[in-house]
Amino acid sequence: MFSREEVRASRPTKEMKMIFDVLMTFPYFAVHVPSKNILITPKGTVEIPENYQNYPILAIFYVKYLMKKNPYDLLPSTVNWPEPYVVVNTITKRFQDHKLFANKNADVYVERLQNAIASGIKIPESKKNERLGQPKKTKNVTKEIEETFIDATNARKELDEYFRKLQDGTLTGDLEGGLCKVKTLISCKALFGGHTQELQFMATNVRKVWIGEIVCGMVSNKNAIDDNDLEEEERNASGEQTTTAREESEALDTTSNGLDALNTQINAIETEESFWEAIRALHNELRTSPTQLEECRKAAVFLLGHKKILQTFTKQKDTARALFYINLKECLGTSWNLEYTEASDARKMAIKGELQN
């Protein structure tokens, strides 16, 4: 029989218990066979790679880490080994976080441990925080390309060359899988030359088309709602209304309040003269504001009861669109073709641009 003193002496010290915990000595077992450079475990045999052969403790720790991570799986025949310094960082972190060092400095123990099990391993300064179990952070390197065209003399030629470089990959050839942000600044004078008056016409026509589309869209939505209400009334007259139909009718009634309620909320347009005056005011505005949307709604309410004026307004909108295309063609020349084609490879893009006098 062992005496009490002998039993007490055979127990591991606190420092040894800490080492057992950090290196996961139990309950995971791995036998190192130096002659064959393998590790034999209850879950399979693992071959030690060359960069771990001089550091068997690191190899054993990593294999035990895999067994702990997947307790119900066998070890794969081909193990994906990290760099040795990643395992060293993991062991160091486990030392520093151990409860034994709650009020102590672990640096002395860490230095002694590294000299014992990882002597000669250099840890890059930028990799000191890389440990096992951390998701790899991928950083997309964004290449910024900025071009500015302000000279009206050679602008067309320079733009044609610029788009050609984008198309053939000259500007984006060294991305190495990263992202590319292209920023192009083209002055109106460089792009349109002396056609500043045409540019003003284009801006005015764009404004007319935009206002026209908003007003006509509101009119179309109201007409669609009214058509649905009419069908609902016919179903009510024939006695074929169902519970679902009643719910739909209530929803349509709620939606149709959008334009009708504006007659009581804002001053409605009552005459044709006031309608065209409101439209001209919208065309002359240089900036957008919430009040302009209300004016568009008033115009839409007026057009709902004046179909002939609606037809005239629609024709004017279409004419403005046609004039915009004509002005654009005159400013840019006989051909302006810009096409974008998406590709699976971030380094590739298809951009075609042509400028001709």
Curated annotation (Swiss-Prot):
InterPro entries, per the entry: Rep_fungi
Keywords: Plasmid, Plasmid partition
Ranges for region Disordered: 226-257
A biological process term (GO) from this entry: plasmid partitioning
Protein role: Plasmid partition require REP1, REP2, and a cis-acting DNA sequence (known as STB). REP1 may act by intercalating in the yeast nuclear matrix and binding STB either directly or via REP2.
Protein name, per record: Trans-acting factor B
